[in-house]
Every structure is written in structure tokens, then in C-alpha cells.
A protein has these predicted regions:
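Alpha-helical substrate-recognition element adjacent to the catalytic core
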Residues: 1-147
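Conserved acidic, metal-coordinating active-site core of Asp-based
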Residues: 134-175
Length: 175
């Protein structure tokens, strides 16, 4: 079967932004010392042979509770505005889409982000309207809208699953 769609897939942290999304958002919000926080995560992962992203997401909830902050979707949406992008990122999508439209009329471009970062933040970023879909780690939110545990965890190794999903057109987790 001949296809005419090119999927451009980006990581987020360090690819579209100079720092991780957490450095712009949740870490300052919780007033954490970034170096100490990440060192504690790595120490726990090494001591327990645990998955770093699971430990990180659980620790965020614990830290938030200890300072009286509820992690909610609204909180993540608010924090997304604080993200800074590399120079040219915001123009990139318009420029590449325009180039393809002008020079290759039978080709379509689809832009995706696959990130270990927070899906809820990715959904609220200023570049989201340029993206076909975003994949990231997600929390389960209880009936009060509070994050209670990691629902979906994206790691460096699970990112390949999302490439497969994009290729097969199965972008929902229930598929």
C-alpha cells in the first residue's frame, strides 16, 4: 500500500526545549531543589531496581502533598505556559508544512511528540495546535481531579511502542 503521509516525531525535553519540562513547571512549583530531587530519584531507583519514571511520578505526588499542593489537570495546564522553546521551534511547523505544501502537493505531514514528560502539560503547550498527537506519561485523576498514581508511564524503551502506534494508526491506548 502506498502512503503519502510523513510523520515527523519529536522528543520534547532537550529536543524542542533546552531543559526538561519539569525544570520549567512542576519542580519550581513545588519549590524543589532540582539536583537533590533527581539525585533522590536515582538513588531510590538504584536501591530498589525500580523504574525511574514511576518513582519520579510517585515522588511528585508525595512532595505536592507535603506542601499542600494538589496536582490536577488545571495545575498542569497553568504550568505549560512557563515552558521555553529553542529558537525557531515555534516557526518550524509553519515553515516545514508550507514547504511541503508548496513543493510536494501529494504529501501530508503529521507532527508528533513522544515524551516521558507529562501528557497533561504537553496537551497545554503553546505548540500543541501544530501537533497531530502527543504521547506522554499520565496520572490517574480521582473523582476530585487530583493525581493519585501513574496511569501511563513513557520511558525511553516504551517510546518505540508509540512509533508502532503511529505507523499502524492505533493512537489510542484502548486500541
Amino acid at each position: 500500500m502506498r502512503q503519502n503521509t510523513i510523520a515527523l516525531v519529536y522528543d520534547f525535553d532537550g529536543t524542542l526545549t533546552p531543559k526538561t519540562m519539569q525544570e520549567y513547571t512542576i519542580i519550581p512549583r513545588l519549590k524543589l531543589n532540582s539536583n537533590k530531587f533527581w539525585a533522590d530519584i536515582l538513588n531510590e531507583a538504584n536501591a530498589t531496581d525500580g523504574e525511574i519514571m514511576m518513582i519520579y511520578m510517585r515522588q511528585l505526588i508525595s512532595h505536592a502533598e507535603s506542601v499542600g499542593i494538589k496536582i490536577t489537570k488545571d495545575e498542569f495546564t497553568f504550568m505549560a505556559d512557563k515552558i521555553k522553546y529553542f529558537s525557531g521551534v515555534k516557526d518550524w511547523f509553519k515553515n516545514i508544512n508550507g514547504y511541503i505544501k508548496k513543493n510536494h502537493k501529494n504529501i501530508k505531514i503529521a507532527h508528533y511528540v513522544i515524551s516521558a514528560g507529562h501528557h497533561e502539560i504537553l496537551e497545554a503547550t503553546s505548540i500543541r495546535n501544530n501537533l497531530t498527537n502527543v504521547f506522554g506519561s499520565q496520572y490517574y485523576f480521582d473523582k476530585h481531579g487530583n493525581a493519585t498514581f501513574p496511569k501511563i508511564v513513557v520511558t525511553d524503551t516504551t517510546k518505540t511502542q508509540f512509533l508502532f502506534r503511529i505507523n499502524k494508526g492505533k493512537e489510542k491506548f484502548s486500541e
